[in-house]
């Protein structure tokens, strides 16, 4: 089954008025597609436009200052990482890759007084950059910036190539190469790079000279392709870089298309590389560790052995092929609305458990969800309606109590009507600039509602609302009428539109199919790139998406969510959830058990709101739902608990107490259940996005019934 069928391709729900964004992108001259807001190249059109963009393994930075002009290429080896704040501590809090190390800067003599950067074709995996002189003239350098690109490729038209380096050049050597020109460039840091040149005209020549230790020059205007790549150091290279790079030099990837199929518990997806130049050759593209774990045998055969370090995701290896085929098995088809055991045991509810759950539900159902969710934040209101939806779900599907269910469902529908009719404190609008659904809260204050107006955290926010709507649809199918369906579908299209044929929204705004997880940062400039603070709210969105598919009998949506959850599981357990045996992350941080805030250029065992250990851990647990154990395995939960949480669990008492214990139920549901059932588990230990009803039902349903 093709799972990338559009949700809908028609106009957006008229309940959302149209409005331009207060901060339009810079330098986007034209675009055939809705502008991506949460992708790796965002720094090219935001703020100063001079912060890096990480395509992995390379990063590129536009320079237009007093010293350098053009597009700088950087690559940082593992040995250059900076650990801190005390590099000798075990574990360290963070590490980052140093900035401003511009190995080679693609430029032109005509850029001596400045250059312009224009952008177009903003797509899921790529964007096209064009450099031109600030003075009159028609010369350009067109550079497709593509995730995983093996070369940084620039097509020159009528410009005189110049190359600079902030690290400084040591030597250059011309090497015989039959298809064009090749130079071996050594920098003063000992690193070696290759530069290839392919003139369009066979009569043209390309002669590169070392003008100074900071500049390589040519003497004539040039039209044709120039490609630059780094020779790996011996610690990661077990092949012959000359041979491998030579075989693919002259062809370059301009964009990547995605396709995906699901059959039962197996999902497959493909990256197909559109190419230019010598298109008869196989392009060279670098794969991340989680890609290599999932490659089919038809792709594994093209591994070259050429490796370069990524910034935060381990060593990447180059594959010379026009298509990647990836397979994910054991999709979470068994996961639905109700808890299931992840560590053995039965999900049968004992009379004792049912009595405790009923007592909690009888109290929680009286919660005033209508007024409590009348807030200025889509995120916080979403947590509250989702929490109450869980109470209603338990009343109906676990307790079978129609009185409690009807009482709760009536109030939940009333609370959700405020959002489906868009009459909350800060209504949503359709942004005609970036083509998305945003809160009006940030038009006067960009960081209002956690930056929702500027595309921060949409999958976090919408996930809670979609979950609540899915529960209503399950308990009362008559609620699934046009206006309510269109509300949910608009949120889905905004965050996870699966197809470029839906031209009203960017394709997969939050989820990054290349790195395998979402990015929460929207259109804010950042020296370390986009980031994600809460992995659990990432998969909560996909879980809610699946549940909505279930109540709508939408098998495409269900299967797409299942596949994305499997990809996310692979990615999170490769890069973010760590144990002492993890090999991808450096040993200096493994003792944190979770990377913390994951940026494109660093990881920081921290949160944006607290330095407390329980927050650093808990932000990757909230909310605990039936899907949690699929991504956070019982083994991982046990090791993390023993090392990081058990030493602190009795040293504090607040809403994070319940969050940590609910996560522990994945491994030890009986102890978690007994904790929740005890008289000492008071209301102050329950988060506003959870309830005692849900905690008891979750732990019992995971196998913890007494």
Curated annotation (Swiss-Prot):
Q: What is its EC number?
A: 3.2.1.39
Q: InterPro entries, per this entry? A: Endo-beta-glucanase (IPR005200), GH81_C (IPR040720), GH81_N (IPR040451)
Give the residues annotated as coiled coil. Answer: none
Keyword Hydrolase listed? The answer is yes
Query: Where are the catalytic residues?
Result: 457, 533, 537
Which reaction equation describes what this protein catalyses?
Answer: Hydrolysis of (1->3)-beta-D-glucosidic linkages in (1->3)-beta-D-glucans
Q: What happens when the gene is disrupted?
A: Severely decreases occurrence of ascospore release from ascus during sporulation. Decreases sporulation-specific endo-1,3-beta-glucanase activity. Abnormal endocytosis. Following cell division, decreases levels of bipolar cell growth in the population. Leads to monopolar localization of myo52 and bgs4 to the old cell tip. Leads to abnormal localization of scd2, scd1, and activated cdc42 to cell tips. Decreases interaction between actin-organizing protein arc5 and endocytosis protein end4. Stubby cells with abnormal actin cytoskeleton organization.
Per the record, the domain of life is: Eukaryota
List the residue ranges of the region (alpha/beta subdomain).
233-330
The GH81 domain extends over: 1-703
Q: What is its main location?
A: other
**Keywords, sorted A to Z:** Carbohydrate metabolism, Cell wall biogenesis/degradation, Cytoplasm, Glycosidase, Hydrolase, Polysaccharide degradation
Temperature dependency = Optimum temperature is 50-55 degrees Celsius.
Question: Positions of the region May provide specificity for triple-helical beta-glucan?
Answer: 602-604
Q: What is this protein called?
A: Ascus wall glucan endo-1,3-beta-D-glucosidase
Species this protein is from: Schizosaccharomyces pombe (strain 972 / ATCC 24843)
> Source taxonomy lineage?
Eukaryota, Fungi, Dikarya, Ascomycota, Taphrinomycotina
Q: Which gene encodes it?
A: eng2
């Amino acid at each position: 089954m093709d799972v990338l069928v559009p949700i809908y391709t028609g106009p957006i729900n008229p309940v959302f008025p149209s409005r331009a964004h207060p901060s339009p992108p810079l330098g986007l001259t034209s675009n055939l597609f809705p502008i991506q807001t949460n992708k790796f190249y965002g720094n090219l059109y935001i703020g100063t436009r001079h912060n890096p963009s990480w395509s992995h393994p390379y990063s590129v930075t536009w320079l237009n200052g007093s010293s350098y002009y053009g597009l700088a290429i950087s690559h940082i080896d593992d040995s250059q990482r900076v650990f801190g704040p005390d590099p000798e501590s075990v574990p360290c809090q963070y590490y980052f890759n140093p900035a401003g190390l511009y190995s080679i800067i693609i430029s032109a003599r005509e850029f001596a007084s400045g250059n312009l950067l224009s952008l177009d074709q903003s797509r899921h995996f790529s964007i096209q950059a064009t450099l031109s002189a600030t003075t009159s003239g028609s010369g350009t350098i067109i550079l497709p910036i593509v995730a995983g690109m093996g070369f940084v490729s620039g097509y020159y038209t009528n410009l005189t190539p110049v190359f600079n380096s902030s690290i400084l050049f040591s030597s250059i050597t011309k090497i015989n190469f039959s298809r064009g020109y090749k130079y071996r460039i050594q920098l003063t840091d000992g690193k070696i790079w290759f530069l290839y040149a392919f003139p369009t005209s066979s009569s043209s020549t390309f002669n590169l000279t070392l003008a100074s230790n900071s500049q390589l020059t040519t003497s004539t205007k040039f039209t044709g392709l120039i490609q630059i790549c780094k020779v790996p150091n011996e610690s990661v290279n077990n092949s012959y870089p000359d041979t491998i790079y030579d075989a693919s030099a002259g062809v370059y990837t301009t964009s990547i298309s995605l396709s995906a199929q699901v059959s039962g518990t197996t999902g497959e997806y493909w990256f197909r590389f559109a190419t230019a130049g010598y298109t008869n050759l196989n392009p060279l593209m670098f794969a991340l560790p989680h890609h290599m774990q999932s490659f089919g045998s038809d792709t594994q055969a093209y591994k070259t052995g050429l490796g370069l370090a990524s910034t935060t995701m381990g060593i990447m290896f180059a594959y010379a092929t026009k298509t990647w085929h990836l397979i994910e098995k054991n999709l979470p088809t068994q996961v639905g609305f109700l808890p299931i055991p992840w560590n053995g045991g039965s999900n049968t509810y004992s009379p004792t458990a049912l009595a405790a759950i009923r007592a909690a539900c009888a109290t929680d159902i009286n919660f005033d969800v209508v007024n409590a969710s009348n807030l200025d934040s889509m995120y916080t209101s979403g947590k509250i309606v989702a929490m109450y939806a869980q109470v209603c779900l338990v009343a109906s599907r676990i307790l079978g109590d129609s009185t409690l269910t009807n009482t709760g469902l009536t109030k939940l529908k009333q609370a959700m009507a405020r959002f489906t009719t868009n009459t909350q404190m800060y209504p949503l609008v359709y942004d005609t600039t970036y083509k998305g659904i945003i809160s009006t809260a940030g038009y006067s204050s960009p960081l209002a509602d956690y930056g929702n107006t500027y595309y921060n955290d949409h999958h976090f926010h919408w996930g809670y609302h979609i979950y609540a709507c899915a529960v209503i649809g399950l308990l009362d199918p008559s609620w699934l009428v046009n206006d309510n369906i269109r509300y949910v579908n608009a949120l889905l299209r905004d965050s996870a539109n699966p197809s470029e044929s839906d031209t009203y929204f960017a394709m997969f705004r939050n989820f990054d199919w290349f790195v395998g997880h979402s990015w929460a940062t929207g259109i804010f400039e950042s020296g370390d790139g986009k980031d994600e603070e809460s992995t659990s709210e990432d998969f909560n969105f996909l879980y809610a998406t699946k549940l909505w598919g279930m109540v709508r009998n939408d098998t495409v949506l269900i299967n797409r969510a299942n596949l994305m959850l499997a990809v996310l599981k692979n990615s999170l357990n490769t890069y973010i959830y760590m144990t002492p045996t993890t090999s991808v992350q450096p040993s200096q941080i493994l003792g944190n058990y979770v990377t913390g805030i994951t940026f494109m250029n660093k990881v920081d065992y921290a949160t944006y709101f607290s330095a407390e250990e329980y927050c650093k851990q808990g932000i990757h647990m909230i909310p605990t739902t039936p899907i949690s154990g699929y991504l956070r395995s019982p083994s991982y939960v046990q090791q993390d608990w023993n090392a990081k949480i058990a030493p602190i669990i009795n040293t504090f008492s607040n809403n994070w107490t319940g969050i940590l214990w609910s996560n522990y139920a994945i491994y030890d549901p009986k102890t978690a259940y007994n904790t929740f059932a005890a008289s000492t588990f008071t209301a102050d230990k329950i988060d506003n996005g959870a309830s005692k009803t849900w905690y008891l039902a979750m732990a019992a349903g995971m196998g913890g019934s007494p």
